[in-house]
């Protein structure tokens, strides 16, 4: 079972490291699902359709969750800002409906 951190944001990577969340491999982008296996975990801020794909493969998805005020949208946040915004890692399970 491998834990993948998928993020291109240095602040998120620094925050996850600072908080002590362990991961095996860092990816800046999830190109395809070929390397993923049932029982793996992906941590990131991915679109819901990709989370549904991952869950259908038996991959656990953990989301870097936070509420970003309007004035910080589009801004590269630091680890300190993520902490101030009460960021947390939450596990989600998404199922695509017919």
Question: Can you describe what each PLM-predicted range is?
Answer:
Residues 24-32, 48, 65-71:
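Short, acidic/turn-prone active-site loops that include or flank metal/cofactor-
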Residues 47, 52-53, 61:
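Extended, well-folded catalytic/binding cores that form a central cleft or groove in large enzyme
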Residues 6-8, 40-46:
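Short His-Asn-centered micro-motif
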Residues 1-27:
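Short, charged N-terminal beta->alpha structural module
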Residues 1, 33-40:
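Flexible, charged surface loops at secondary-structure boundaries
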Residues 60-98:
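Ser/Thr/Gly-rich flexible loops in soluble cytosolic domains mediating phosphotransfer, phosphorylation
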Residues 17-18, 54-57:
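Short amphipathic alpha-helical segments
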Residues 12-13, 33, 50-52:
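Short, well-ordered alpha-helical microsegments
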């Amino acid at each position: 079972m491998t834990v993948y951190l998928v993020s291109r944001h240095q602040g998120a990577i620094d925050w996850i490291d600072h908080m002590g969340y362990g991961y095996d491999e860092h990816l800046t982008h999830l190109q395809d699902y070929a390397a993923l296996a049932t029982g793996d975990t992906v941590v990131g801020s991915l679109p819901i359709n990709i989370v549904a794909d991952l869950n259908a493969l038996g991959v656990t998805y953990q989301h870097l969750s936070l509420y970003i005020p309007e004035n910080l949208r589009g801004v590269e946040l630091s680890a300190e800002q993520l902490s101030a915004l009460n960021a947390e890692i939450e596990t989600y399970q998404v199922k695509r409906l017919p």
